[in-house]
Amino acid sequence: MNSRRKFLKNLTAVGATVPLVSNIEAKPKKNKGPVILCSRGEMWGEKVLKPGWDILSNKGKLLDAIEISSNVTELDPEDTSVGYGGLPNEHGVVQLDASIMYGPTHNCGSVAALEGIKTPCSVARLVMERTDHIHIVGKGAQDFARAHGFKVENLLTENARKIWLRWKENLSSKDDWFPPSTEPYDEIRTTGTINVLGIDSESNVAGITTTRGLAYKIP
């Protein structure tokens, strides 16, 4: 009986606190948006973010803003990290991955091992907006892109080709895909990924990641 009484007493005490807890609601801070940011901003922040900021600051669409900012690096042939000009796989073929997420709908879309398309994040957005899929890969991703008007092109620039050839010439004699011991690992097997995040004036959040993955990866 004592244990039952103690249980009911404790239950009553807990119940009494419920209204107090429910009344302690976090008051939203005054919105400070819009905001747009990117990884490695110290290197290319102004160049990458300005197109997206121009859209957001004029009350344009959040997804348009982060996509156009991501496209800046994807379309830059001098940048070997992502998109056009990215370092290829071991066969000298550039394969790209990208993903996009949109806070208001909780939806996402992505592509992987996409060849011949300079702006994979734009294809990922179409996967999110025009299909019930989350992820499309390889030839299927390329076919999907072509069906939506994307042009298939050779993404291997002369600069990236020379870097790849230098890697091929210095492959391990054991054929084990590890870099030669005479050179630093990060100079041989670099990764290339960028991220762009945005918040609009309504505090909606969205983000894009675009990458060519590990340089000289096994396809």
Show which residues each predicted segment covers.
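Alpha/propeptide regions of enzymes that mature by internal proteolysis
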Residues: N2, L11-T12, A16, K27-P219
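Hydrophobic h-region of N-terminal signal peptides that target proteins for export
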Residues: T17-S22
